[in-house]
Amino acid sequence: MTAVLIERAQADPLATVRLNRPDKRNALTLGMWRDLEQAFKQLEQEDALRCIVVRGAGGNFAAGADLSEFPALRASATQAPAYGRQMIAALIAIRDCRHPTIAAIEGLCVGGGLEIALMCDLRLGAADCRFGIPIQKVGVAMPYPELAILTQMLGRPTMLALLLEGQLHDAAWAERHGLLTRIATDLEADLSATTTRLAGGSPVSHRHHKLYTQRASEVLQALDSADVQRSYAAVETADYREGIAAFFERRTPKFPGN
């Protein structure tokens, strides 16, 4: 089963990119990050396209990273940057796509799933959707490239609330703090109306506004390569090893703090 699908009828100005691991609540694998990047690079080239919807299969957007991959793919500060670079490449491909994008959110929108949603231009959420970045429960730190992009969007107070508390928040909280554009009483009806509005607008206008609102918001100071590398160091700590072990053993982690 393909875990990232592009759904588009012939000559349809709308495409849907669907995260398709419903049995795992669309938990994200490294392969899915690669497929997401390629999907958006492919759709970027289609001149007749007017809007892209990103959504999950089976009633959830995405439940975050598939932690079962971490012992093999994110076990050291040497491995982790390669995984991180692929994540960032996919996120930037979504953010910088010239076509307007909408995240249609149901159920869980957590961790990497929330990052994907935040890269979309508009985010419509069903009333029962939930949001969070429970990374502190795994004992690892969000690498700087991801942290910079999200802090730029949400602001430091909201990012710290998400990262330090690790709670799942409801749609009303998400709307107040900018994670959602709006709550949709009827998600499918709101999505249909929104895609119609976007498709009816000028592609030139859309491209201009997407590009220059992004340029205007790029105010965070870039770190040098050594700082970026240091931001991956948490994967070599006892806290990270304990967090991963606790996940697989289905118990509450006891973090030593080093």
Kindly label every feature range from the protein language model:
Residues 124-129, 180-225, 232-236, 255-258:
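C-terminal long alpha-helix characteristic of the crotonase
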Residues 48, 56-93:
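Glycine- (often His-adjacent) and acidic-residue-rich active-site loop
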Residues 64, 84, 88, 111, ...:
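Glycine-rich phosphate-binding loop at the start of an alpha helix
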Residues 90-96, 104, 110-163, 177, ...:
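CoA-thioester-processing core
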Residues 1-3, 245-258:
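Terminal low-complexity tails and localization/encapsulation signals of metabolic enzymes
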Residues 166-173:
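Acidic, divalent-metal-coordinating active-site segment for phosphoryl/phosphodiester hydrolysis
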Residues 1-57, 92:
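Conserved CoA-thioester-binding segment of acyl-CoA-metabolizing enzymes
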